[in-house]
Swiss-Prot record:
Homotrimer of disulfide-linked HA1-HA2. Major glycoprotein, comprises over 80% of the envelope proteins present in virus particle. The chain crosses the membrane at residues 532-552. The gene is HA. This is Hemagglutinin. The keyword Magnesium does not apply. It is found in: Virion membrane; Host apical cell membrane. Binds to sialic acid-containing receptors on the cell surface, bringing about the attachment of the virus particle to the cell. This attachment induces virion internalization either through clathrin-dependent endocytosis or through clathrin- and caveolin-independent pathway. Plays a major role in the determination of host range restriction and virulence. Class I viral fusion protein. Responsible for penetration of the virus into the cell cytoplasm by mediating the fusion of the membrane of the endocytosed virus particle with the endosomal membrane. It is a single-pass type I membrane protein. InterPro entries: Capsid_hemagglutn, Hemagglutn_HA1_a/b_dom_sf, Hemagglutn_influenz_A, Hemagglutn_influenz_A/B.
C-alpha cells in the first residue's frame, strides 16, 4: 500500500504545472568584448567602426571640390601657363592637390610663407580674381618681354599669368612708385616677387641698374628686398631664381610699391568673397561625380557610425578616426541557447531551462518572457513591457554615442618648411599621441558599455523572476533554474494572471497548502521505509555471511583440510 501511495505522489509531481522565466536566444554568432570577458556571443550587436569608403573625391554637401590635377597651389595662384583651366574657379568645398604636382613654380625659386598661405586657404571657399594694376599701365617699362622658356605655352616662352616681370625699356629702368587702395569690402590676397639674376651681366642686361631694391608697404607690412646675385646650377634651364611673396590687404588699406629693378609686379589679386571651413587635401584620386558629408584622401565616407579607421585626415561631418580594427557594441543579450539534454530513466521530468541554464530560441517576439506547461499544453510568451523598455534603453544609448561622436570635425594635414622640421616632427608625435589616447578612450567606452548592457539584460531577467516569485510565494516551489512548480493546478487563465501581475494568491493558497503537506508527508514516510529496508538488508546480509563461513569451516574439517579440536 505504501509503495502505491509513493508511486501516485511521484506521478502527481511529474504532472505538476510549471512556469519558467527566461530570455531570447538565436543562431547569432556575433561576438563582443567587455571589461571582464572577450568574445562574448550575443543575440544582437552593432558595428560602430566604419571601415569602407568609395575610393573617390566627391562633392561635400553639394559643393564641388577644387581639384588642381597636375597643378600646385602656387601654380594656380600665380597663374602657371599650364594651369589656365583654373584662371577663374567657382566656389569650392575643399582643395585637392597631388603630392608632387608637375606644374608648380615653372621658373625655379621659392614661395615665401607658402605653408602659412595654405593654412589661410583652409578657411576660404571662394576667390574672385580682380585686376589691380593693368599690364598696359607700365608705359616706361617692358611688360611683355618678361617671359621664360621655363614657362612654355603652346611651344613658346611665357610667364605666370597673374604677375608681370618688368624689364628695362630703351636702356632705362625708371624707379617705380605705385600704390593701390583696397576700396572693396572684402580682403585682398596680393602676390609679387623678386628676380635673383645669375650674374652682374644678367642684372644690367635686364634692369640696367647694377644695384636695385624693392620696397612694399601696407599698414601692417614693411618690406625691403634686394636681389641676390649668385652663380647657381640650372633648374628648368634657368640659373636665376625667383622669390614670391604675399599679403592680405584689408578694406580701406593701401599697398605701396617702389622699385628700380628686379621687380615682379602684381597684376591680379584675389578678393576673398567667402570664408568657411575648407581644407587642402593631398590625394591622387579622381573626381567621382558623387556627394558626401565626409571626405578623406582615400575616398568618401557615407556612414552614420561614430568611428572610422580609414584615414586620420578628414573634412566635413566625419566619424572620429581611431586606430582600432574592431569596435562592436552589444545591443542584445548573451546568446546561450538551451542545450538539449537526455531524459533520465528515473526521476522527475527536467524543467524547461530558464535564464540560468540557457536562452530560448522558441521565444522570438521579445527579449524576456515565460514558458508555461499545464494540462492544456505549453508555450512561450514574451514580456512585452520589459522588452520594450530594454529596447528603448539600448537604442537611446547607441544613438547617444553616435550623436556625440558625429559632430563637425576637421583634421587636415599641416605643412612645414625646411626650417621647421623639428616643429613638424613634434607636431606628428603630438598628433600620434592624441590618436593613441582617442583610440584607447573609444575602445574603453565600448568595453564599458558592453559590460553595462549585458548586466542590464541580466538585471531585467532577474527582475522578471522576482516579480513572479513575489506573487507565487509558497504556492509554488523554486526549482533553482528559473522555473517554478505549482503546488496547485494552474490553467491558462491562471498562467496569464502570473504573467500580467494579477495572480490571486489567496485563491490558490489552500489547495497549495494541502498538496504541499501531502508531498512533504510522502517524502517523510518514504524516507522511513527506506531506513527500515536498509537495516533489514544489512542484518540479512551479515547473517548470510556468517552461515556461509560456518558451512565452509565444517566442510574443510570433514575432508581433513582443517583440523578441528573441541575443548
Amino acid at each position: 500500500m505504501k509503495k502505491i501511495v509513493l508511486l501516485l505522489a511521484i506521478v502527481s509531481l511529474v504532472k505538476s504545472d510549471q512556469i519558467c522565466i527566461g530570455y531570447h536566444a538565436n543562431n547569432s554568432t556575433e561576438q563582443v568584448d567587455t571589461i571582464m570577458e572577450k568574445n562574448v556571443t550575443v543575440t544582437h550587436a552593432q558595428d560602430i567602426l566604419e571601415k569602407t569608403h568609395n575610393g573617390k573625391l566627391c562633392d561635400l554637401d553639394g559643393v564641388k571640390p577644387l581639384i588642381l590635377r597636375d597643378c600646385s597651389v602656387a601654380g594656380w595662384l600665380l597663374g602657371n601657363p599650364m594651369c589656365d583651366e583654373f584662371i577663374n574657379v567657382p566656389e569650392w568645398s575643399y582643395i585637392v592637390e597631388k603630392a608632387n604636382p608637375a606644374n608648380d613654380l615653372c621658373y625655379p625659386g621659392d614661395f615665401n610663407d607658402y605653408e602659412e598661405l595654405k593654412h589661410l586657404l583652409s578657411r576660404i571657399n571662394h576667390f574672385e580674381k580682380i585686376q589691380i594694376i593693368p599690364k598696359s599701365s607700365w608705359s616706361n617699362h617692358e611688360a611683355s618681354s618678361g617671359v621664360s622658356s621655363a614657362c612654355p605655352y603652346n611651344g613658346k616662352s611665357s610667364f605666370f599669368r597673374n604677375v608681370v616681370w618688368l624689364i628695362k625699356k630703351d636702356s632705362a629702368y625708371p624707379t617705380i612708385k605705385r600704390s593701390y587702395n583696397n576700396t572693396n569690402q572684402e580682403d585682398l590676397l596680393i602676390l609679387w616677387g623678386i628676380h635673383h639674376p645669375n650674374d652682374a651681366a644678367e642684372q644690367t642686361k635686364l634692369y640696367q641698374n647694377p644695384t636695385t631694391y624693392i620696397s612694399v608697404g601696407t599698414s601692417t607690412l614693411n618690406q625691403r628686398l634686394v636681389p641676390k646675385i649668385s652663380t647657381r646650377s640650372k633648374v628648368n634651364g634657368q640659373s636665376g631664381r625667383m622669390e614670391f611673396f604675399w599679403t592680405i590687404l584689408k578694406p580701406s588699406d593701401a599697398i605701396n610699391l617702389e622699385s628700380n629693378g628686379n621687380f615682379i609686379a602684381p597684376e591680379y589679386a584675389y578678393k576673398i568673397v567667402k570664408k568657411g571651413d575648407s581644407a587642402i587635401m593631398k590625394s591622387e584620386l579622381e573626381y567621382g561625380n558623387c556627394n558626401t558629408k565626409c571626405q578623406t584622401p582615400m575616398g568618401a565616407i557615407n556612414s552614420s557610425m561614430p568611428f572610422h579607421n580609414i584615414h586620420p585626415l578628414t573634412i566635413g561631418e566625419c566619424p572620429k578616426y581611431v586606430k582600432s580594427n574592431r569596435l562592436v557594441l552589444a545591443t542584445g543579450l548573451r546568446n546561450t541557447p538551451q542545450r538539449e539534454r537526455r531524459r533520465k530513466k528515473r526521476g522527475l521530468f527536467g524543467a524547461i531551462a530558464g535564464f540560468i541554464e540557457g536562452g530560448w530560441q522558441g521565444m522570438v517576439d521579445g527579449w524576456y518572457g515565460y514558458h508555461h506547461s499545464n494540462e492544456q499544453g505549453s508555450g512561450y510568451a514574451a514580456d512585452k513591457e520589459s522588452t520594450q523598455k530594454a529596447i528603448d534603453g539600448v537604442t537611446n544609448k547607441v544613438n547617444s554615442i553616435i550623436n556625440k561622436m558625429n559632430t563637425q570635425f576637421e583634421a587636415v594635414g599641416r605643412e612645414f618648411n625646411n626650417l621647421e622640421r623639428r616643429i613638424e616632427n613634434l607636431n606628428k608625435k603630438m598628433e600620434d599621441g592624441f590618436l593613441d589616447v582617442w583610440t584607447y578612450n573609444a575602445e574603453l567606452l565600448v568595453l564599458m558599455e558592453n559590460e553595462r548592457t549585458l548586466d542590464f539584460h541580466d538585471s531585467n531577467v532577474k527582475n522578471l523572476y522576482d516579480k513572479v516569485r513575489l506573487q507565487l510565494r509558497d504556492n509554488a516551489k523554486e526549482l533553482g533554474n528559473g522555473c517554478f512548480e505549482f503546488y496547485h493546478k494552474c490553467d491558462n487563465e491562471c498562467m496569464e494572471s502570473v504573467k500580467n501581475g494579477t495572480y490571486d494568491y489567496p485563491q490558490y493558497s489552500e489547495e497549495a497548502r494541502l498538496n504541499r503537506e501531502e508531498i512533504s508527508g510522502v517524502k517523510l514516510e518514504s524516507m522511513g521505509t527506506y531506513q527500515i529496508l536498509s537495516i533489514y538488508s544489512t542484518v540479512a546480509s551479515s547473517l548470510a555471511l556468517a552461515i556461509m563461513v560456518a558451512g565452509l569451516s565444517l566442510w574443510m574439517c570433514s575432508n581433513g583440510s582443517l583440523q578441528c579440536r573441541i575443548c
